[in-house]
Amino acid sequence: MPTLLLTGFEPFHTHPDNPSAQAAQELHGLELPGGWGVHSALLPVEPHAAGAALTRLLSEQDPGAVLLTGLAAGRPQVTLERVGVGVMDFQIPDNAGQTYRDQPIEPDAPAAYLATLPLRAILAAWREAEIPGDISNSAGLYVCNFVLYHALHWLREHGRGAVPCGFLHVPANAAVALAVPADRPPLPYLPQSEITRAVRVAAEAITAQSSVLQMGKM
């Protein structure tokens, strides 16, 4: 059975919850059309620990597709990231209390990698399912961008560059939105069930496209 590796992140910063973690946990073990199975895992919000965990997952699971997810509090809808860039630069401490400035992720590696997910097919599937979504041209320079770049680099370096791989940012859920202090601007949010549904539809679109490509090579 081919595997889609699905990751989410633990809660971080001031957020009491991470909707990407909930979606990943809810979809673990899901059987998708075409005989695909979902293997979910949670990543720590610390770049080096997340990179080590992701390397282990990629090596052990040997996935046929990779869908990384994380929270982008403030975005009103689900968004697919087009590119991962090879630098860390953030002032919000990670969960190890660290910040980084202009720090290369992989010295002497490409400055950026384009995601290899079927972005337009996912957008079309969302639209058919009445889920608003879009493509983003910046995953930021925090841990979300780190794991996107790390996964794409690892796959390329290990001869797996054709494996569909990319990142999906989800908006806040109600728990995250309700944790915002009353004197701060409110966050847009979606019910957790809708966030999970968007991740599931994306996974189905990825594996459907991959199955078609595999059949074309037979």
Curated annotation (Swiss-Prot):
Recorded catalytic activity of this chain's protein: Release of an N-terminal pyroglutamyl group from a polypeptide, the second amino acid generally not being Pro
Active-site residues, record numbering mapped to chain: 81, 144, 169
InterPro entries attached to this UniProt entry: Peptidase_C15, Peptidase_C15-like, Peptidase_C15-like_sf, PGP-I_bact-type, PGPEP1_Cys_AS, PGPEP1_Glu_AS
Keywords noted in UniProt: Cytoplasm, Hydrolase, Protease, Thiol protease
Localisation: Cytoplasm
Pfam families associated with the record: Peptidase_C15
One GO CC term, this protein: cytosol
Its EC number(s): 3.4.19.3
Superkingdom assignment: Bacteria
Protein role: Removes 5-oxoproline from various penultimate amino acid residues except L-proline.
Stated name of the protein: Pyrrolidone-carboxylate peptidase
The species this protein was found in: Deinococcus radiodurans (strain ATCC 13939 / DSM 20539 / JCM 16871 / CCUG 27074 / LMG 4051 / NBRC 15346 / NCIMB 9279 / VKM B-1422 / R1)
